[in-house]
Amino acid sequence: MTRILLLLLRFYQYFISPLLGNNCRFHPTCSEYAKEAISMHGSIKGLWFTFKRIIKCQPFCDGGYDTVPISIKNSKPLNKKI
C-alpha cells in the first residue's frame, strides 16, 4: 500500500502539479510532506498527517515551515551513556 501511494504522489508531482503552478503555502510542499509522512509512518498514519496538513492549507492560514512529526519509535536517545 505504501509503495502504491508513493507512486501516485510521484505521478502527481511530475504530471499534475506543474499544470497547477506553485500554490502551496507551506514548506515543504504538501505533496513532499505526504511522501515524507507516508515513508516515515506508513500508509494509514501518513495519510492522516497528510489529511491534517491539507486541511490547514487554506487562505486563512499563513503557512510557513511545517515538518512531519518524528516517530518516537524511530528516534534515537539524545543522551547516550558511555
From Swiss-Prot:
GO terms for cellular component: plasma membrane. It comes from the Bacteria. Belongs to the UPF0161 family. Keywords: Cell inner membrane, Cell membrane, Membrane. It is a peripheral membrane protein. This is Putative membrane protein insertion efficiency factor. It is found in: Cell inner membrane. SMART domains: Haemolytic. Could be involved in insertion of integral membrane proteins into the membrane. The keyword Cell inner membrane applies.
